Structures are given as structure tokens and as C-alpha cells.
Amino acid sequence: MKVHLFVTCLIDTMQPNVGKATVEVLERLGVEVEFPESQVCCGQPAFNSGYTKETIKAAKNMIKAFETAEYVVTPSGSCKAMFLEYPQLLKEDPVWSTQAEALAEKTYELTEFIVDILHVTDVGASLKGNATYHTSCHMTRLLRIKEAPFTLLSNVKDLSMTPLPRAENCCGFGGTFSVKMTPISEQMVDEKVQSIEETGAQYIIGADCGCLLNIGGRLNRLDKPIQVMHIAEVLNSR
């Protein structure tokens, strides 16, 4: 099986280790991974800021970048969710709208792909310690991907999982929200950090780099000894 990797801007520019872990996990499962170099930003920052024309341009670029893919896999629920906006954005053009629907249908978040398409629940990972999991808004509310991450994490050897109190509360990142509504965002991430501390976890795990950067930044400022890990990194741990 061959997939095209949608690496996302945050991973490409700030957390390339997550992209590397994603590739290594997939290859270990027998998947051939290709990286289309023509891929660009999915357009979510422009979309959230109301720049429709710029978003449409980004959407068309992404549709062309992945038009030959059978499967597109991304280690980001947020960016996959953006692909679901493309058909509506391009509804005035039947040709582009149809292509947008095709892209949305063949794109999978990493854990969703592993569990639902590869039918794998144990990737052979091992990580000693206690962890809790942050369920990002896009993963739970828009994509309805709730079970796959927990299924995979439950099979990581030597890893103990503790439920996160108020788990579905937003961390306060929200893309441009954290820039436009900084005081509110700060209060939200403080509440998230408090919830994480209540678990006594050594690791906070998530599937969206935006959330993890926000939470990790706050933990660092507060000098909290809790390690932030993307789920791809956990699944790649040995």
C-alpha cells in the first residue's frame, strides 16, 4: 500500500520530528510513503481570518498536489478537517468541487488510518511511564475521531494512561484565536495545564501540533516537568 503524506506547516517548520516519526511508523507497518513536494499550506489560517480568495487558491494547490494519491495521511486532525471545507469553498465550480470532495474522502488522520484502514491496533511501541491524552477540538468535534488514539495508546507497552479531567475542553490555541483573543486563550491553556497536573502524568500526548505547542509553551513557562509528545512519536517509541 502507498500513501501520500500531508506533513502540515507546523510539523514541517517547527516539529519535523513528528513527520519523521509518522513516516517510520507507517513504513514499519508495510506502507510506502511518498511526500509530494508541491504541497503547501492547507489554507486554514487564511480561512479562519476570512480571506476566502486566498483560501481557495491554497485549496486548489493542495487538490493538485494530491490528485494522484490513493490515500492521503496526515498527523493532524485540524488540517484534515480543513480539507472538509474545500467542497463548500469551491461549490461554484463543479469540476473543482468534485475534486475537492475526492480529496476529502481519501484523506485520513494518522491514527484513523492505522486503525480503520490498516486494521492495526498494536504497532509494537513501548514507552515507560504514565501519560494522559488531550483530545483536540477538530479531532473530536469535527472529525469524530475519538476511539482510534486511545485504542493505539492502550497497546503501548509499559505505558499507563490516566484520563484527563475535562478532556474535551479547548486548550485555547484555535489557530488565529490565540493571537486575536490572547487573554482568553491564556486562561484556557492555564485551565488545561491544571487538568494535566491533576493526573500526575509524566507525558501529555496529543494528535495536533498546534495544541501541543500551546500546551507545551505554557508548561515550559510555568517550569512544569511534563513532557509533551505527539502520538506519532509515542507510536514510534521503542
From Swiss-Prot:
Pfam family, one: CCG
GO-annotated molecular function: oxidoreductase activity
Gene Ontology annotations for the cellular component aspect, listed alphabetically: cytosol
One GO-annotated biological process of the protein: lactate metabolic process
InterPro entries for the chain: Cys_rich_dom (IPR004017), LutA (IPR022822)
Function: Is involved in L-lactate degradation and allows cells to grow with lactate as the sole carbon source.
Family affiliation: Belongs to the LutA/YkgE family.
HAMAP family: LutA
Annotated protein name in UniProt: Lactate utilization protein A
